A protein has these predicted regions:
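Extracellular/periplasmic catalytic domains that process cell-envelope and extracellular macromolecules
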Residues: 84-88, 140, 180-181, 193, ...
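Short aromatic-acidic-glycine turn motif
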Residues: 167-171, 313-324
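N-terminal, post-signal-peptide metal-ligating segments of extracellular/periplasmic oxidoreductases
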Residues: 18, 22-157, 165-167, 177, ...
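N-terminal secretory signal peptides
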Residues: 1-12, 16-23, 27
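Surface-exposed interaction/gating patches
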Residues: 253, 257-263, 271-315
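Extracytoplasmic/periplasmic copper-protein system
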Residues: 42-70, 81-84, 212-257, 338, ...
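Surface-exposed intrinsically disordered loops and tails
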Residues: 120-125, 232-239, 343
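Extracellular/periplasmic metallocenter environments
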Residues: 146-157, 164-230, 333-378
Length: 378
């Protein structure tokens, strides 16, 4: 990168095209504005900052990105399930690559990304699409997992899973296989435990750079109902994708993330699933008579915490998703440090249809992209 050039500052992000936060009431108007002039996060010369509350106008080219905000919510990558000697086995192929991601209209971020041939984006394209966040890998407690990793990028990378596994499978420098050099491959193998809402990310050095560039994704381990009894077994069935009780729940994944577009160690863009204001331009439709289950993960670099606040409603929260009973009941805001995660459950039963806002309750984060809407429908 040319050291004489800087990326996009807060001021420039807002210059790409903006309206005041008061304009949130006119959501429909945001969907019909002219696209912004393309801006590279590595070659636009800027300086200064502006904390003015604003949001972008225009549209991100999701087709160019190869993935869509609404698709990221619902795409669970189950890999290739099988059986060996009577035991359930599940395998994935994960590839790390370098690519640009459009994170706001006309604003491109030079990312390092994970892709999988069994993600919705890759299946649709007929080739592996690298995405941020990476594919949501989903399995069942007790399964034997094999993750075949290929580093097709230009820097050493790893896969580090949050869960229980041996030191040899930890995916950290200097232990086991350690960092995987460009062109290298390695298979991570371990048992899926404990059940819960987990994550994976690159653990190569420098760690903050590899995470900030986009090498992370959700890792969900469904509980095995056969290991539970009574009411807990029924709850486990509703959290396990193989059971009909799970089909009655609307499940979503949001990874809270952010982007330092001028590489000064501070974020200029914040988002839910990478695209600034992605769920303002396309609100998330939810049926008011259906239980909503949100797998929420914070992978924001450079800021100590991120948060979720839902307007006009309250939710139950399961920290790390490793319990079948809520760890917090009837709250409307929760905060997470980096890599903290949990399950948010709520319903709009009895509510009138309409747009219900949700966002980070750090006001700056909301003003710079981490703002969204649920659209409650009958």
């Amino acid at each position: 990168m040319n050291n004489q050039k800087k990326g996009v500052s807060r001021r420039d992000f807002l210059k790409i095209g903006s309206v005041g936060v008061a304009g949130l009431a006119g959501v429909a108007g945001l969907r019909a504005v002219a696209p912004a002039t393309p801006t590279s996060a590595e070659n636009r010369q800027t300086h200064g900052g502006d904390e003015h509350a604003a949001m972008t106008v225009g549209q991100v080219d999701h087709e160019r990105n190869g993935f869509y905000p609404l698709e990221l919510l619902y795409d669970f990558d189950y890999g290739t399930p099988g059986e060996e000697a009577g035991r359930a086995v599940r395998e994935w192929n994960i590839v790390a690559t370098d690519r640009e991601i459009e994170i706001a209209p006309g604003l491109f971020f030079p990312g390092w990304v994970y892709g999988s041939p069994t993600s919705a984006a890759s299946l649709r394209a007929g080739r592996i699409i690298g995405q941020v966040p990476g594919p949501t890998l989903r399995c069942v407690e007790g399964e034997r997992l094999r993750v075949h990793f290929t580093n097709a990028g230009t820097h050493p990378h790893t896969l580090h899973f949050h869960g229980i596994h041996s030191a040899q499978m930890d995916g950290v420098p200097g232990v086991g296989r350690g960092m995987i050099d460009p062109g290298g491959t390695f298979t991570y193998e371990f048992e899926a435990r404990p059940f819960g809402c987990h994550l994976y990310h690159c653990h190569a050095i420098p760690l903050k750079r590899h995470i900030h560039k986009g090498l992370y994704g959700a890792f969900i381990v469904d509980p095995d109902p056969e290991r539970q009894e009574g009411a807990a077994q029924e709850t486990a069935r509703s959290r396990n994708h193989r059971y009909p009780e799970n089909e009655a729940v609307n499940e979503m994944v949001i990874v809270m993330n952010a982007f330092d577009t001028n590489f000064d160690g501070e974020n200029e863009v914040y988002a839910a699933n990478t695209i600034a204001f992605g769920y303002v331009n396309e609100p998330i439709q939810v049926r008011r008579d259906q239980l909503q289950r949100l797998y929420l993960i914070n992978m924001t670099e450079f800021d100590p915490i991120n948060s979720l606040h839902i307007h006009g409603n309250f939710f139950d929260y399961y920290d790390h998703g490793t319990t079948l009973e809520p760890t917090l009941r009837t709250v409307d805001t929760v905060m997470q440090c980096q890599a903290q995660r949990g399950i948010v459950e709520f319903s709009f039963g009895g509510f009138e249809p309409g747009l219900y806002m949700f966002h980070a309750h750090q006001s700056e984060f909301a003003e710079l992209g981490w703002m969204s809407f649920f659209e409650v429908i009958d």
